[in-house]
């Protein structure tokens, strides 16, 4: 891909790091990756993996490419992290249960985290941390429908929601009820 685009290829194992226990090393990664990206105008960086202290490849869990995109967005101080997937953003309900659920236009990081924890899986929940900390919004977009606006994920919104309930997600064997009043 990098050759086709004429961009520099950056091997994730040289800029994304894990500790000896296999945990992501955010501090070292941000330092090395930020420095590398300062010296690079355009690059292709594959997702899903990095390197351990011994240099061997270590992978993120399922959805690791979402995390990689978030890490790179933070390191290059992006104004937006666009995550392209096979759906037009986050939906108000699981399409396997509810026919033709509508996409959510805008959702906060907190609301998305709660939906992800309860089974909504359009974006890996760990992909939220790096960009949220940096104040970078996320836009979930559909590769098969690039004109669709997707779902914008932000810290907070002054926009009045279309619905009282942002979304519904479920997980067998788990119940949580949270009610907030503004």
Feature locations, PLM:
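Nucleotide/pyrophosphate-binding catalytic subdomain
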Residues: 1-128
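Short, glycine-/Ser/Thr-/acidic-enriched flexible segments
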Residues: 50, 65, 77, 88, ...
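Terminal amphipathic helices with adjacent charged low-complexity linkers/tails
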Residues: 91, 140-157
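Flexible, glycine/charged-enriched surface loops at secondary-structure junctions
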Residues: 123-126, 137-146, 179
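Active-site scaffold of zinc-dependent metalloenzymes
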Residues: 134
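A conserved regulatory-domain signal marking ACT and ACT-like small-molecule sensing domains
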Residues: 149-182
């Amino acid at each position: 891909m990098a050759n086709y685009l004429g961009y520099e290829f950056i091997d994730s194992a040289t800029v994304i790091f894990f500790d000896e226990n296999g945990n992501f090393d955010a501090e070292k990664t941000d330092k090395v990756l930020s420095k590398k990206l300062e010296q690079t105008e355009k690059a292709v960086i594959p997702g899903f993996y990095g390197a351990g202290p011994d240099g061997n490849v270590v992978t993120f869990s399922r959805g690791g490419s979402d995390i990689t995109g978030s890490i790179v967005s933070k390191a290059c101080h992006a104004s937006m992290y666009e995550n392209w997937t096979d759906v037009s953003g986050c939906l108000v309900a699981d399409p396997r249960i509810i026919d033709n659920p509508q996409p959510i236009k805008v959702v906060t990081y907190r609301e998305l985290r709660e939906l992800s924890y309860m089974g909504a899986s359009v974006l890996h929940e760990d992909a939220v941390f790096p960009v949220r900390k940096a104040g970078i919004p996320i836009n979930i977009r559909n590769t098969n429908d690039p004109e669709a606006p997707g779902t914008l994920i932000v810290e907070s919104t002054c926009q009045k929601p279309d619905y009282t309930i942002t979304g519904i997600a479920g997980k067998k064997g788990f119940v949580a009820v949270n009610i907030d009043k503004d």
